[in-house]
Amino acid sequence: MRKELWLGLLLSSQAVLSTIYYKETFEPDWETRWTHSTAKSDYGKFKLTSGKFYGDKAKDAGIQTSQDAKFYAISSPIASSFSNEGKDLVLQFSVKHEQDIDCGGGYLKLLPSVDAAKFTGDTPYHIMFGPDICGATKKIHFILTYKGKNLLWKKEPRCETDTLSHTYTAVIKADRTYEVLVDQVKKESGTLEEDWEILKPKTIPDPEDKKPADWVDEPDMVDPEDKKPEDWDKEPAQIPDPDATQPDDWDEEEDGKWEAPMISNPKYKGEWKAKKIPNPAYKGVWKPRDIPNPEYEADDKVHIFDEIAAVGFDLWQVKSGTIFDNIIVTDSLAEAKAFYDQTNGATKDAEKKAFDSAEADKRKKEEDERKKQEEEEKKTAEEDEDDDDEEEEEDDKKDEL
């Protein structure tokens, strides 16, 4: 009882101390908070929908890409811009590739102040995070910006590829570590400096270091004790074909003495080579020693974004139909988890059940159509057979006359 009370008080204190900077569940008035970019005239449009299947129609409503082979650009301001200095930064949202996407992005951007009408793929951003699918590429993108450069994540964990809703969470901690979760399950973690090329390396190979002249690079050597067997060269490489016979029309006076054609000798052992043994002098692969990098500059603020002011989707999709929902930006993973429990976590089982039911109906419809087609083909074949029988009867009558 005391343990449960203590945990409850701890969670309550975390909730009191935490801050939710942005939250979006896409209610019917969502367009009052979001702006489609007009920087290009052919951008695709988002629409509000729960999709073809859902667990709860109201809770599962989100914005969906609605036009194939289109770029999309839409953003929403954060009421009060903020810096994540001294605290964690958590970005979370759900993605539902209902269309069984073949090529397209599903990522969200954290932005500085932006002119929403002019928002494009070239607009500077702080973070780009989320799934990316195109052909064999099925990965979670996590790009950070540092001093104006967009830095790719060294890791490429696989993203979810089914047509159900999945929640992606990125956590950048105040100690410069990070976590990536999918449906509240940790998929990756590490340090920013190790998993992004943010800073110059602390050490570099010494350009003055040279490989010693007596360094042995070969891991194996010829066995000096191995000797070629005395009968190794006894058999020649080729021999006359023992199954060949002189043709009956062979004339030695005209054709010369007949000789059987030569064939490969199955007993020939080939060129003898002494066997290899481990080289006792082998020292391993040589590499120069590491020395401190004179260009390395420590920075304990690589995780800090001074002005986080908006969220936005900047996407390209070949086949539209992705639904985005339940965005939260906070400084507390516990808050993000609680939000998940209230939204996707609360409806995922019902959504899966609805999906399974829709798939069963689809299979039944396909089976009914297949049977109908088979019956029509069978009926057509029987009618053709009857026509053939009638023609044969008429031909028989004509023959009798």
Swiss-Prot record:
Residues 187-252 are annotated as: 4 X approximate repeats. The keyword Metal-binding applies. Pfam families: Calreticulin. It is found in: Endoplasmic reticulum lumen. It comes from the Eukaryota. Residues 199-263, 341-401 are annotated as: Disordered. GO terms for molecular function: calcium ion binding; carbohydrate binding; unfolded protein binding. Residues 199-214, 224-236, 348-381 have a biased composition (Basic and acidic residues). GO terms for cellular component: endoplasmic reticulum lumen; endoplasmic reticulum membrane. An alpha-D-glucoside binds at residues 107, 109, 125, 132, 314. Residues 256-294 are annotated as: 3 X approximate repeats. Residues 1-18 form the signal peptide. Coiled coil: none annotated. Keywords: Calcium, Chaperone, Disulfide bond, Endoplasmic reticulum, Lectin, Metal-binding, Repeat, Signal, Zinc. Residues 246-256, 382-401 have a biased composition (Acidic residues). PROSITE patterns: CALRETICULIN_1, CALRETICULIN_2, CALRETICULIN_REPEAT, ER_TARGET. Disulfide bonds join 103-134. Sequence repeats lie at residues 187-198, 206-217, 223-234, 241-252, 256-266, 270-280, 284-294. InterPro entries: Calret/calnex, Calret/calnex_CS, Calreticulin, Calreticulin/calnexin_P_dom_sf, ConA-like_dom_sf. The keyword Thylakoid does not apply. A motif (Prevents secretion from ER) lies at residues 398-401. Its main location: endoplasmic reticulum. Can be divided into a N-terminal globular domain, a proline-rich P-domain forming an elongated arm-like structure and a C-terminal acidic domain. The P-domain binds one molecule of calcium with high affinity, whereas the acidic C-domain binds multiple calcium ions with low affinity. The interaction with glycans occurs through a binding site in the globular lectin domain. Molecular calcium-binding chaperone promoting folding, oligomeric assembly and quality control in the ER via the calreticulin/calnexin cycle. This lectin may interact transiently with almost all of the monoglucosylated glycoproteins that are synthesized in the ER. Belongs to the calreticulin family. This is Calreticulin.
